[in-house]
């Protein structure tokens, strides 16, 4: 009598590569005709956004954009004036076993953003961003169990082990909107910069949903 063990599967992911790189970004900004000449730069602020994450054969390509705001004192002295530009960048990682069926997650940190005045009508932006990526591929987890129709006099040696599996690699884009009351604001007030910081307080799984609070 032939007895075959029953093989069971559970879909999961496994990490096949992770790496961190520092990307150098540079771009020039020409002062528009509607703006005054630059006397002195007082503030440079940079915020990033991830545009795409592409996984191809043997590599992961992360594309993003750095939004730079520059606040400067014009040659006339007052009032303060601003310049802004969007600088695209990309960072490529070699992941030997990656293919188009894999998924990648990325994190970006702005290390530094500096402004150099080339002349009163032109500045150079030099920035460094740290790009981190992790690449995951599908990996079915399997185990064997005794068949339901096994004879009563058949005995099976069993063992157990704890396994922690990655069950999902996904992302979601959402928008936020809120009002901020400001005092001592008049018609001549200028909005100079709007840095934003996101903080996560908790992440809980409820049924098939991941609830993130922050």
Regions found by a protein language model. Give the residues of each.
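Viral structural modules
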Residues: 1-214
